[in-house]
Amino acid sequence: MADDGCSGLSDFITDDELFNEVTLNEVSDSQTGRPTKRRRLNSHEINTDSTGRREIEEAGTDSDTFDPSLPPNSKTTGRGRKSNDDNPAARKPKTYTPKYHVDQKPLFVTQTQPSSSPSRIRGPRWKAPERNKPSTVSKAKQKSPLPAIWGRKPSTIGSHGTNGKDIDAAIAASLRSFEEEQSARGDAEMLDDSIEEPGDTQVHATPGPVTNAEKETIFDFEDIPDDAFDFEPEFTETADKEPILISSQPRPSQNTTRRPTASQSTSFRQTTLLGGFASSSSKRSSQPATQTWPSSSRNEPPTHHELNKDALRTWIFPKNLGSRREYQFNIAHRALFHNLLVALPTGLGKTFIAATVMLNWFHWTKDAQIVFVAPTKPLVSQQVDACFHIAGIPRSQTTLLTGNTPPGVRAEEWRSKRVFFMTPQTIMNDLKTGIADPKRIVLLVVDEAHRATGAYAYVEIVKFLQRFNNSFRVLALTATPGATVEAVQEVIDGLSISRIEIRTEKSLDIRGFVHQRNVETITFENSRDMITSMELFAKALQPVVDRLRNQNAYWGRDPMALTPFGLTKARQEWNSSPAGRAASWPVKGTINSMFTVLASLAHAIDLLKYHGIGPFYRNLVSFEDSVLKEKKGGKCASQIVADGNFKVLMSKLRSWTNTEEFIGHPKLEYLRRAILNHFLDAGGKNGGDSEGSDSNTRVMIFSHFRDSAEEIVRVLRKHQPFVRPHVFVGQANAKGSEGMDQKTQLEVVGKFKTGTYNTIVATSIGEEGLDIGEVDLIICYDGHSSPIRMLQRMGRTGRKRAGNIILLLSKGKEEESYSKAKDSYEKMQQLIASGSRFTFHTDKSSRIVPQDIQPEAEEKMIEIPIENSQLGLPEPAKRSRAPKRPPKKFHMPDGVEKGFTKASRLGRTNTDSNGRSKRKRVVRTPSPELEEFPDLGDLCANQSQELADDPDFQEIAGKQIPRLRMDVYPEHQRSLRPTGFIEHGKYTRRVVKTFRKISKLGFDCEAQYRAIVGDPDDDGEGLEGLSTDREDDPQSVTAHQSREQPPRVEKRCGTEELSSLDIEAFFPNLAWPARPEAPRPESDGTDNRDQKPSQRKKRYMISDDSDVFE
């Protein structure tokens, strides 16, 4: 038990003398130069008849949950300890005198000092330790003699002189306290001299000291657990060049499943560098270390995509760019089987990884579709180039669709192509209208994935696809996943991410591909002109701020501390406060107007502080014009403009900005000198006209606002052609500034790469993902509190060669914001790598590939098809007339019952609740085919003959039916008889009209006919001169007869030809009554032959509704 004794007292030794065998020098009070160390012991600690429980407890313990390894309560130790009047022995001090001599300096210890937190050593405080159940090893130790201390024999323990018994009791109590602490934590005891045989669980105590040879062979390596040396240090602040351990880097434990051995025990535990004990139950990474893919216990339904079994045997890694990079190889392999979020610094090949994954899924499936989405068209075009010239995806199978493509053309492309490069809004519209089939999509690649928060189109696309398709892969690419834990978790939830692969510039596997970037931070004080402007502007705004303070709506006093966000929050709080709710409408309107005016002017304050006098002056000019000319802002704005301080300020600003050489901010002067020095150091003297000039070096400047970007360009243009700057902004038009469409943006980027421009001043449009080219110097004109934007800016340089970054910050808020962004980025990288704060969606990440298939990597050169050498993007050709938009199509998820379902059948499957099967649908027998129709002429002739010969047609019930006669009831034939429900038809009216005309014909109709038409035997000579008048009234006929010119024959049609027939021959039985002639209308003597048909008077107009006859 000698070894156990050393282990038991090892906690009393400091860190710098751990496990050193020492002996205390036997010195007396007269030999030492300092007083002896005194230790005060309670009476119950040295009581010989005390049980093991009382010996463990220190004096003054409050409860049973007190940990004996911790320092005692302050009320019971030291000077503040209360005395026990009932036990006078407790007041008597005990002197501890060392008896053993050592070569080292004497060491005096009074109590154990654990290096870890109490909850980590003894467990939670609400759980009392199980002290009544000592382990078997503890009992064996109690029966064995006390171990040798510092190499001495056990017999020497009792030789302490006068106080020997007290010292022995104190040491024994300390040993038992340590043993009880170990058993209370449930951990195994420290190593003793017992050797455990395989399969034997009994402890064999071997008394006596342990030699050094025995110590070397005492370990049984089979008893060491697999994770004994899987130590993962906590993240601490490291130097810039110190690597950061990340969870996604390969570890042996992540590729194999741990299998415990037969003799595995808990006799060993891992010690941290700080002296504590590592906790094996803590969650170490976002990816479980013991899980292999695919999981044998996870049963997934087979995919509905048609897979290519031959191609699934391998997965292709292109070598067109040269030697492979291990991090790209590992990330691409994991992206084939997981919904992966890839976080890589800019310029490290995220586009190549996406092209590799797209190529493999293109070969693995036969007709499934692959979609790549990016927020802007320039980002989409970058991926198109990688897929064509690196992955070798055929151009004929790809297309680029944006909102400018007509829906009819997009529908045709969705039916014929397999690889699509789109903007997120376009694909979302195609999915909603049914143009795109969500069930055919097998891979969705998302660029700039940090945007996938809230209701952005990325999130809506994934949600829509999951409604119809449970077998598709998601690959998300970004350089900065998020600024907070909540933002990263929102991205994980929105895209159903199951794994994260993250790398930083300090990661071991990418250090060889990241060039050094020197970051230089420069801070600036406000200039005299800026201070003067701030003072005048503050005096102009002070009355408005005081009015808000008097209304308890705003608590700030300094107008220069106004911010748009602060004013917005103050307005919301005042409106929701009792004072705001109880205020009258005029008061509310006045206060809200003041908040609005101050919020607009707070932006001008930011421009003055961080961007200079020029942008500040232009903002105030716009504000002044809106008040004086457009009459906006109300009384509050008019009061500010009319203030004397404001007028003095505008006068000074106007005089300063009219000076050509005026520079409104110290940042701008430093920026100008830094750019000139950079080009001079690069060897350029003639602006790139000679060899060795600055034609190979580029500078990029980032500014948050367009006003400051244009101010920078104005200053730099004075040094042309040495410095050739150009502004680079977004598409939207701003007040006083025009936007740049995507075509213009690509042209500017192309000229920047070729050297036409060597300096670009960009807003946020140049931050995300755009391949600007090789930039040697990055200047951030203003700091930003967002780590995403900060890292996007810095990632523009240091890709193929070393780069420099200059940060221009104003002292105060801007400097603090940058520091906060930097710390937030580093902390987020650690949290993402650990994965301990995120929840991943492994249940929504199906493998798609069958579990019995394990594709093997195949590295090879990809043969690029000849069709990929064509210039331009694979956009559909423009047509003179676009195809019609197809009707909206509703896609249904699998297993959905289509059609109408009764309420009684809801929730039922093939059988009802009683076990009865559904009623089978009645199948109707097909009706016999119809015979061909006979010829209509033959049919009519046969029917007429049959009716004439059929006696049944003429007789009903033995009575003969008279034949139809047209000569009876003539009065009824010339009138429309009353009807009940159905009106008279068109043909009925015509027949009645015809009979009316016939009835009006007199007995002299033949003579009248001959007079008008002429002799029927005439050969038609002289017909050219006949009249073509269509009037039929007798007066008109008489007028024509009186003319000397020969009459003209007028062709008549219809029933009017009946006037020349002999009516009596047709109706011999009719008695024709003598009818008086109708009065003829007097002629006005005008000739109607030249009138238009619509202007002529119509004769014989019969009302169809008239039933009255003469």
Curated annotation (Swiss-Prot):
Sequence positions that bind ATP: 344-351
Record GO biological process: double-strand break repair via synthesis-dependent strand annealing; interstrand cross-link repair
Record carries keyword DNA damage: yes
Gene: MPH1
Domain Helicase C-terminal: 675-846
InterPro entries: FANCM/Mph1-like_ID, FANCM_DEXDc, Helicase/UvrB_N, Helicase_ATP-bd, Helicase_C-like, P-loop_NTPase
Subunit organization: Interacts with the MHF histone-fold complex to form the FANCM-MHF complex.
Sequence motif DEAH box, residues: 447-450
Signal sequence segment: none
Biased composition (Polar residues): 24-34, 246-273, 287-300
Enzyme class: hydrolase
Keywords, sorted A to Z: ATP-binding, DNA damage, DNA repair, DNA-binding, Helicase, Hydrolase, Nucleotide-binding, Nucleus
Residue spans of biased composition, Basic and acidic residues class: 42-57, 178-188, 891-900, 1041-1055, 1077-1093
Biased composition (Basic residues): 879-890
GO MF assignments: 3'-5' DNA helicase activity; ATP binding; ATP hydrolysis activity; four-way junction DNA binding; four-way junction helicase activity
The protein's role, per its UniProt record: ATP-dependent DNA helicase involved in DNA damage repair by homologous recombination and in genome maintenance. Capable of unwinding D-loops. Plays a role in limiting crossover recombinants during mitotic DNA double-strand break (DSB) repair. Component of a FANCM-MHF complex which promotes gene conversion at blocked replication forks, probably by reversal of the stalled fork.
Domain Helicase ATP-binding: 331-499
UniProt protein name: ATP-dependent DNA helicase MPH1
Residue ranges with Acidic residues bias: 189-199
Domain of life the protein comes from: Eukaryota
Annotated region (Disordered), positions in chain: 24-165, 178-212, 236-305, 867-937, 1013-1055, 1069-1110
Catalytically driven reaction(s): ATP + H2O = ADP + phosphate + H(+)
CDD domains the UniProt entry points to: DEXDc_FANCM, FANCM_ID, SF2_C_FANCM_Hef
GO cellular component terms given for this protein: nucleus
